[in-house]
Every structure is written in structure tokens, then in C-alpha cells.
Amino acid sequence: MSKLKIDTKRRFSLLIALVLIISLSSCATTQTNVTAITTKTVFNQETTYHNLLKLKKWQANGVIGIIYDNQAESANYTYLQDGDNFSIKLYGPLGIGSIEIKGDTNSVSLANSKGQKLTAKDAKTLMLEQLGWYVPVEGLKYWIKAIAIPNIRQTSELNTNNLLSKLSQNGWSISYSNYQLVDSKYPLPTKIRMSRDNLTLKIVIKSWQI
């Protein structure tokens, strides 16, 4: 076989491989259908709350910024929630490699890229010990959907769409912006700011999968 035919065959193989990689990447980043919410759209507050409360399973992907004790860090994240089970993967410029926090109502574990795994009764204790900061996972499964934890005292403000713009609950002050309609039913935020004491979390949600 001539060199020209070999080169042509190699190029064809590389082209097929490239197409497969692009296809797989597209599948990996596919998100649930989203549409913009106009300023004229006004949601029924009670209906919206109950729809979001019933939403028990999702995946959110994006970037989180952490400010604590005059330090600042950031990371990419993938957050999965399925009922009471959750998984938060953090990776990127954290300075500690990638980590995954998994848990349910009974226990929480933290695994790092070195293969080390630690367990505790709650995520706050584990994250403070290992990272120096924490994500309030018990409340986050509600707050990331822009709803309050049921049956716990809270104060809130609504925007012109009748969606949460501010929420204070469990000692946290939370603000929301840039909502989008996911799956033609769920108005979900793309930017969240959470503050308590000397800790501030800035969460950008780039995609929702439900």
C-alpha cells in the first residue's frame, strides 16, 4: 500500500475519532430545555413553590466562588440531588485537587483525588475540618431552587416576576438573580449569593438537568 493511501486512511480514522469526541462532549453537556423569562412574566407564587418543592431530583453544573477569613477561592462544581441523597463534586483551582462530598440524612463522606476518604455525621463539620469553609447542604437542596426550607422561619422579598430576590433563613442571607424557565415549568436561578458571618458563597449555575 502506498504512503498516500496510509496517510489518507490515518486522516479518515482521526476524523472519525474527532467526530465521536465532539458527539460525546455534546451529550455530556446537554441540559434540560431552558427559555428566558421576560420582565412581563408573573408567576403564581403558591403554584411555583409547590412545583419546586416536588422537584426532588436534578443536576446543576457551574462555578462557585468562596470568600472566607479574607481569603478567596473558586472551583467548578457538579451538584446532584436525588431525594435525600446528594453529591457535590468540586474541581479546578482549589489548590487541593478535586473532591467529592456525598451523603444522605445519616452520614456524609469526603473523598479527594489522592484516594483519601473521610466520613462524618454532617457536611459542615467535615468541610470545615478539611477545607476551612462549608456549603450548607441541608438548606442548599431548597435554596438552590429559590425556595425556603419548609416550616422554618424566614423573611423574603420578591422580584417583579413574583420570584424570590432575597431570602433570610437559618442565619443565611441569600440573593437571587437571572432566572430562567427550565423544562417549561420550573423558574430556576442562574446566580445565587449566600452569606453568613465571615463566609460568602457566589454560585453561578451554567446548566440544569432535571
UniProtKB/Swiss-Prot annotation:
Chief place of localization: membrane
Extract the InterPro entries matched here.
LolA/LolB/LppX, OM_lipoprot_LolB
The record, for Gene3D superfamilies, names: Lipoprotein localisation LolA/LolB/LppX (2.50.20.10)
List residues with covalent lipid attachment of type N-palmitoyl cysteine. 27
Domain of life the protein comes from: Bacteria
Q: Which UniProt keywords apply?
A: Cell outer membrane, Chaperone, Lipoprotein, Membrane, Palmitate, Protein transport, Signal, Transport
Bilayer topology reads: Lipid-anchor
Tell me the disulfide pairings in this chain: none
Give the positions of lipid attachment, kind S-diacylglycerol cysteine.
Answer: 27
Check the UniProt entry and state the signal peptide residues, or none: 1-26
Asked whether the UniProt record includes Chaperone among its keywords, one would answer yes
What's a GO cellular component annotated to this UniProt protein?
cell outer membrane
Cite a single GO BP annotation: lipoprotein localization to outer membrane
Tell me where it resides: Cell outer membrane
Q: What function does this protein fulfil? A: Plays a critical role in the incorporation of lipoproteins in the outer membrane after they are released by the LolA protein.
Q: How does it assemble?
A: Monomer.
Could you say which protein family the record assigns here?
Answer: Belongs to the LolB family.
- Which protein is depicted? Outer-membrane lipoprotein LolB
- Source organism per UniProt: Francisella tularensis subsp. novicida (strain U112)
Q: What is the lineage of its organism?
A: Bacteria, Pseudomonadati, Pseudomonadota, Gammaproteobacteria, Thiotrichales
